[in-house]
């Protein structure tokens, strides 16, 4: 068994097996976590058809605030795959690039880590319900994730080479691909805020100005879209900030809890060395959530994340949800203390995803990627030291995936 894992066979086998499971889900028209992606595919298909004869049509004419790039791509694919079944099947094949690109990113970020572990971690992507149904129903989240991971790939290469004096190809490519992600799903524009701060910290002033001009040129179509269709901004911002903070913290806690738990179980020194910090963070997190809960008002039937629905389903109240929000603030604060740029990105994520409807799919598997690829933390390499951590994470995500399938089949949350 030891020789099997050292050769990387287990990780590659998992990748192959789980990619096959995706096509099994395709065969059965899997709609884990609800029929939203399936409904989107058919509801917006007229938009795709009209884009075959028109370069640009705003999505508002078809009842959506999504930006058009994904649907423009589908319209071109439809010229080749005239049957929607085969178009979806081709898109399902393309979606395998998401976990593969995640693996390529991991190879750069964790040079000294066994490739077998990186394959195993990347393969876990196939079990996230949002990834699966988005792949099966040719959803724009997959297109955006591909562009996002291409951007992070060149971002990590740029950081590794430390070429901060010139406008390198890695710099240009990362902003181009992030721009494409934005034109697919507009909330990816939040990452430009983070990147501009990083660029300002690392680049020479003249290089920073040149790059800013490149980004300005890339953003011109976006400004035109906002001018012609101002309502697209509503997708990414709402005045109910207190509600958004609680939901976002709870959703991010969902992905952080198993990682932190595994690390603390296997390395108690990390916990013992930071007891004072954790106690302070716990105290202030409880105070913050206690205050925000007084202003919390949200219809759990239109999103809110796994823990909110679980809280209502089991306890008929929001107490479990508030507890996970507290845990989320504690863990996010811990990451913020590790690195100031972590703090900046976490604030952007907490505040930026302040939509009037917040779904777990906005963070899945994007936040999982962010933790391992973008955050500067000792916890990620610590987690990857032990195969048991990956096993426990697989069990956690598998139960999550299973619960999503059961919920979809029995319509449990839909009938609450």
Predicted regions and their residues:
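Loop-to-helix entry region of an early transmembrane alpha helix in multi-pass inner-membrane enzymes
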Residues: 64, 68, 72, 80-100, ...
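Transmembrane signal-anchor helices characteristic of membrane glycosylation enzymes that use polyprenol
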Residues: 9-41, 218-227, 284-294, 350-352, ...
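Specific aromatic-rich, kink-prone transmembrane helix
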Residues: 49, 101, 143-163, 170-178, ...
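Transmembrane-helix motifs of polytopic, lipid-linked glycan transferases
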Residues: 89-112, 150, 154
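Short acidic/glycine- and proline-prone juxtamembrane loop motifs at membrane-interface regions
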Residues: 133-143, 359-360
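Extracytoplasmic catalytic/substrate-binding loops of multi-pass membrane glycan-assembly enzymes
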Residues: 29-47, 61-76, 85, 185, ...
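Membrane-interface alpha helices of multi-pass inner-membrane proteins
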Residues: 122, 168-185, 192-196, 214-220, ...
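Membrane-lumen/periplasm interface segments of specific transmembrane helices
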Residues: 182, 188, 193-306, 399-411
């Amino acid at each position: 068994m030891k020789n099997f894992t050292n050769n990387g066979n287990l990780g590659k086998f998992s990748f192959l097996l789980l990619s096959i499971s995706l096509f099994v889900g395709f065969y059965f028209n899997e709609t884990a976590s609800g029929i939203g992606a399936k409904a989107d595919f058919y509801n917006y298909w007229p938009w795709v058809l009209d884009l075959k004869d028109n370069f640009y049509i705003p999505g508002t004419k078809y009842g959506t605030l999504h930006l058009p790039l994904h649907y423009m791509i589908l319209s071109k694919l439809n010229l080749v795959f005239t049957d929607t079944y085969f178009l979806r099947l081709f898109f399902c094949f393309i979606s395998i690039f998401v976990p593969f690109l995640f693996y390529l990113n991991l190879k750069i970020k964790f040079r000294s880590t066994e490739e077998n572990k990186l394959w195993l971690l990347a393969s876990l992507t196939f079990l996230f319900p949002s990834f699966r149904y988005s792949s099966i129903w040719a959803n724009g989240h997959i297109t955006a994730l591909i562009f996002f991971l291409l951007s992070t790939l060149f971002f990590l290469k740029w950081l590794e080479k430390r070429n901060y004096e010139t406008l390198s190809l890695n710099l240009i490519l990362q902003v181009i691909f992030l721009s494409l992600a934005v034109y697919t799903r507009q909330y990816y524009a939040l990452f430009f805020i983070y990147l501009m701060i990083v660029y300002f910290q690392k680049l020479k002033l003249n290089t920073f100005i040149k790059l800013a001009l490149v980004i300005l040129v890339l953003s011109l179509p976006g400004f035109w879209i906002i001018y012609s269709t101002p309502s697209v901004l509503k997708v990414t911002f709402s005045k109910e900030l207190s509600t958004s903070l609680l939901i976002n913290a709870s959703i991010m806690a969902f992905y952080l809890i198993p990682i932190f738990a595994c690390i603390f179980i296997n390395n108690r020194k990390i916990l013992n060395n930071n007891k004072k910090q954790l106690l302070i963070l716990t105290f202030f997190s409880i105070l913050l959530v206690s205050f925000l809960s007084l202003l919390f008002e949200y219809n759990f039937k239109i999103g809110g994340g796994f823990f909110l629905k679980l809280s209502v389903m089991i306890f008929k109240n929001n107490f479990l949800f508030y507890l996970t929000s507290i845990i989320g603030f504690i863990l996010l604060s811990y990451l913020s203390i590790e690195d100031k740029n972590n703090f900046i990105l976490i604030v952007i994520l907490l505040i930026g995803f302040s939509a009037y409807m917040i779904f777990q799919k906005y963070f899945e598997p994007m936040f999982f990627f962010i933790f391992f690829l973008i955050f500067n933390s000792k916890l990620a390499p610590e987690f990857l030291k032990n195969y048991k951590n990956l096993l426990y994470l697989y069990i956690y995500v598998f139960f999550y995936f299973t619960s999503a399938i059961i919920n979809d089949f029995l319509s449990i949350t839909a009938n609450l």
